[in-house]
Amino acid sequence: MSYTFSVRDVAFLRSRHGIKALETASSLALTAPSMIADIAELRARYDGHDAALIETVTCRRRARGKLRGAEDLLLSDEALQQATNSVVAQQRAAEISRRFPGAVVHDVTCSVGAELVELTRTAGIAGVIGSDIDPVRLAICLLYTSPSPRD
């Protein structure tokens, strides 16, 4: 069973302290033989956040080859399983743009936003709307689809 993230976890993982914690967790093997020692180290340094850190790093590793920029994503096991492969999402976005130039696309089950990321990168898509019943997944989705100050 995978870890269930909270909105508080998302806020921590995107904070300066959380980003440093993710760097630390990423430097650990997080394999079956090392897991007890790795958990102990993370718990000693980031008590209360160790499970979220381990889930994020192990999911990032599994997402390589499936999701663009996997090394920077916040993912749960369930979200990773349900996320559309970036190549497939890119092809779908291109097809929507070709068939419906200037479209505003609504992904009603956007989860962590894998398809929305590709839609926002595709010329000819006028806008995207994402919705989901899970507030944690929406919080994660907003990280990847909201314009940043430098955009």
Feature locations, PLM:
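Conserved SAM-binding motif I beta-strand of class I
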Residues: 127-132
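Beta-hairpin (beta-strand-turn-beta-strand) motif
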Residues: 110-113, 133
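Conserved small/polar residues in nucleotide/adenosyl-binding loops
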Residues: 144-151
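Conserved class I S-adenosyl-L-methionine
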Residues: 102-109
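Conserved Rossmann-like nucleotide-cofactor binding loop
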Residues: 136
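Conserved SAM-binding loop
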Residues: 141
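Conserved SAM-binding loop of SAM-dependent methyltransferases across substrates and taxa
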Residues: 112-125
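S-adenosyl-L-methionine
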Residues: 2-100
